[in-house]
Amino acid sequence: GVISLPIMLKYGYNPRLATGVIAASGTITQVIPPSLVLIVLADQLGRSVGDMYLGAIGPSFLQVAIFMLFILFLSVFRPKDVPALPPEARGELNRALVLKVLGGMIPSIVLIFLVLGTIFLGLATPTEAGALGVVGAMALAAAHRRLTWDLVKQGMHSTMHITSMVVFILVGATCFSLVFQGMDGSLWIEHMLSGIPGGPIGFLIFVNIFIFFLAFFLDFFEIAFIVVPMLAPIAQSLGIDLIWFGVLLCINMQTSFMHPPFGFALFYLRSIAPRTVKTSDIYMGAIPWLGMQLILVAIVIFWPESVTYWLDKTPEVDLNTIKIEVPAFGNQGGNTMPNFGLPPMDGAPGQGGGNGLPGMPNLNEPPKINP
């Protein structure tokens, strides 16, 4: 935003469109791996972070495509809002420019592979991949001669700030969960939500409407630690894939960065936008992009393959469908085990049974001990 917003305003872009596209582009990072929201949701849903990242690939591409189609529509039907750059402002495509672009892209691609590639290939856990990402980022900063002790302290301070906040929220959420479970609150929630008409789709529609309005007042950490653990068992009982459920909630919760009263993306944009840009323009410019994010939520609800297509297709075994058959003994019918059966009982006690086999001993008489 610091770089692109002044340039767009300089060449006559509509302020609402310019601020909206910057704010919406920033919120995509909540869905595109490596997203912190996906990591937290994977932990709360008991699913692999790698699977959650794979499931988010499809919706990420869909969201970018929806945004691009909207901009293309405006450039065709409302060209005054997105005017073309004058010829003198356009750079010429030459070998030097290509090499410069590649020189800036390759280190970033390597850093992305250190984090995401190692997770997808099973070479590292998310914690180990995060450590590799830190080492790679510090190496890039050192290569550009920007690695200073002040920068390291700033990074450590930000990390401790976020970690402390998450830990305290987790402690409070755990206390709430213990009390809630002790009062059988989960049974009440399950009974209430399982009766929603429409089956799994009706449940997802209700939950996403609920999460959308809840995000007006709560941060995604509070929603993930308090609300999601109550909804996950119900979703699983309805046969909803928890990866699909988690990615869907992640897409929904990114809207909280675009609408009041918090709208962190809008506040950050207000802090960097020039005074000529009105606050009302920033809020009004976010409305179309917020609508497109909700359209993506609807697409993922009715098209779960956009998430599950990228996942491993290994079938899951439902323990409730396993049937165990115990073979019958002797000639009792059914599947019998060979050479396994009770001794014949057609003889009187103390007498030989049929087929020359010994009968059952007479237990009414005292045992006889032969000297």
For each predicted feature, which ranges?
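Alpha-helical transmembrane segments of multi-pass membrane transport proteins
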Residues: G1-P371
